[in-house]
Swiss-Prot record:
Annotated residues for binding of Mg(2+): 20, 22, 196
Species classification: Bacteria, Pseudomonadati, Pseudomonadota, Gammaproteobacteria, Aeromonadales
Gene designation: phnX
Name the record gives this protein: Phosphonoacetaldehyde hydrolase
EC number: 3.11.1.1
Source organism of the structure: Aeromonas hydrophila subsp. hydrophila (strain ATCC 7966 / DSM 30187 / BCRC 13018 / CCUG 14551 / JCM 1027 / KCTC 2358 / NCIMB 9240 / NCTC 8049)
Cofactor: Mg(2+)
Length: 279
């Protein structure tokens, strides 16, 4: 356990973290969903999409992600040239049903925690912090990922899948708020929503929470841990800058490299809460 101490006032300070999964706690670079989108398009329609295209709608529920991917100008132009019409609802359904078994089969390979994250979460939990979570993955994928992550030591207090709630998923606030209810958090302004993608930042803002974007560990940076570790400081800075800019433009209150860097943010938010500030 890391030696992390944050003075905590249980009546006023941050009470809960609401964490995304891929690119936030597990799967450095968020490769499990993106690589499978590419494979699903190839299998279902022998249609190529690039990894960069697959990353652009990241954070949405996976059916919505496929539909948004089909609306990207580059994908839509190629689709219409190939098939003579925009991607239809039925075609999105077919892609989704192709995607799901591939994702379920692959997700356990991407359950490794992001380096440095678990010791920080253990230390925070030891000080009374509640750990909630939600994902753009549907429940069948989460039912495979959650026990795999537990085998690696990550066990949040609660998790919500993108298809669990009648109201829907991101960018709406509902998954984050379902965590608030389940965890018994006393006020949404005492929660921090942490995510590596824009829809997750919007989710936190819509829920009335503080939001923290992750500029290196997730979708926007888009590198494996091994590739990141081999980069020079200049290379890291060049890739971090647009990721940080995108997350800040989405409204993130803070942007850090990875969840392992969250402690100073919590301390600063506690200071702001004590001064009467709200998200």
């Amino acid at each position: 356990m890391t030696d992390l101490q944050i003075a905590v006032d249980p009546t006023t300070d941050v009470e809960a973290l609401i964490l995304d999964w891929a690119g936030t706690v597990v799967d450095f670079g968020s490769f499990a969903p993106t690589s499978i989108f590419v494979e699903a398009f190839a299998r279902a329609y022998d249609f190529p999409v690039t990894l960069d295209e697959a990353r652009q709608p990241m954070g949405l529920g996976k059916w919505d992600h496929i539909a948004a991917l089909g609306r990207l100008p580059s994908v839509d132009a190629r689709w219409q040239a190939r098939f003579g019409h925009p991607m239809s609802h039925a075609e999105v359904d077919h892609l989704y049903h192709t995607f799901m078994p591939l994702q379920i089969a692959a997700v356990t390979r991407f359950a490794d925690p992001i380096p440095g994250v678990l010791p920080v979460l253990d230390a925070l939990r030891g000080q009374g912090m509640k750990i909630g979570s939600c994902s753009g993955y549907p429940r069948p994928v989460m039912e495979t990922l959650v026990p795999a992550a537990a085998d690696h030591g990550y066990r949040p207090d609660h998790w919500v899948a993108t298809d669990d709630l009648k109201a829907g998923g991101r960018p709406g606030p509902w998954m984050a708020l379902a965590n608030v209810i389940e965890l018994g958090v006393n006020a949404v302004h005492r929660c921090i929503k942490v995510d590596d993608a824009v829809p997750g930042i919007s989710e936190g803002l819509n829920a009335g929470m503080w939001t923290v974007g992750l500029s290196v560990s997730g979708n926007e940076f888009g590198a494996t841990w091994e590739a990141f570790a081999a980069m020079s400081e200049a290379e890291i800075a060049a890739r971090r800058a647009p990721a940080e800019a995108k997350l800040r433009a989405a409204g993130a209150h803070y942007v850090i490299d990875t969840l392992a860097d969250i402690a100073p943010v919590i301390a600063d938010i506690n200071r702001r809460l004590a001064a009467g500030e709200r998200p």
